[in-house]
Amino acid sequence: MTKRIRTALCVIVSVLFLASCSSRPDGMHVILFSDMQAGVQEKIKKAAEQNAGKVDIFPAFQEKLLTEITAHEGDVFIVPEDMFQAYDDPENFQPLNGLPPEKTSPYTTVNKKTGEKTIYAVQIEKGKKQLNGYSFQLNRDMAAFIPVYAEKTEEALQLISQLTEAR
């Protein structure tokens, strides 16, 4: 009898240990690529963490972006626009159908059969931004997108919508 209890206890502990090692955060995972000053990065990280479970900020290197996407990390990416244009392929992104219709974006595709326009990424214009009570200045245009494998689409759409609001 004690051997069964020990075995069951080992299985339960192993399952709990493996579950705690999961790389997926409970909330949304935001990945930002930027060459901004550390103080600005911290403001953005604190503001985004109020909506997200995890925020990672990396230097703006194309190779790191491809690594993160290949590893299926992140529910939403915010990258310098010139960096995004090198990776721009609508098949890799979820459509941003939840955004208000007044949002415009240069990143759209048109369905040849229906003529319907689909937004797959948005431009976040440089300038003063506000997110969850934190203000910060973007010195270059950024692009935001949701990769096709992302699980937290609704939360990601809300964050993108906040960042694209004119202030």
Swiss-Prot record:
Chief localization class? membrane
Q: Where is the lipid attached (N-palmitoyl cysteine)?
A: C21
PROSITE patterns assigned to the protein according to its UniProt record, in alphabetical order: PROKAR_LIPOPROTEIN (PS51257)
Query: Per the record's keyword annotation, is Translocase included, yes or no?
Result: no
Q: What induces it?
A: Up-regulated by growth on type I rhamnogalacturonan.
Record's bilayer topology term = Lipid-anchor
The UniProt keywords, alphabetically, are:
Cell membrane, Lipoprotein, Membrane, Palmitate, Signal
**Example of a GO cellular component annotation carried by this entry:** plasma membrane
* Localization, UniProt: Cell membrane
List the signal peptide residues: 1-20
Protein transport: is it a keyword of this entry?
Answer: no
Spell out the coiled coil positions from the record. none
Q: Where is the lipid attached (S-diacylglycerol cysteine)?
A: C21
What this chain does, per the entry, is described as: May play a role in the degradation of type I rhamnogalacturonan derived from plant cell walls.
Q: What is this protein called?
A: Putative lipoprotein YteS
Write down the species. Answer: Bacillus subtilis (strain 168)
Q: What is the phylogenetic placement of the source species in the record?
A: Bacteria, Bacillati, Bacillota, Bacilli, Bacillales
Q: Which gene encodes it?
A: yteS
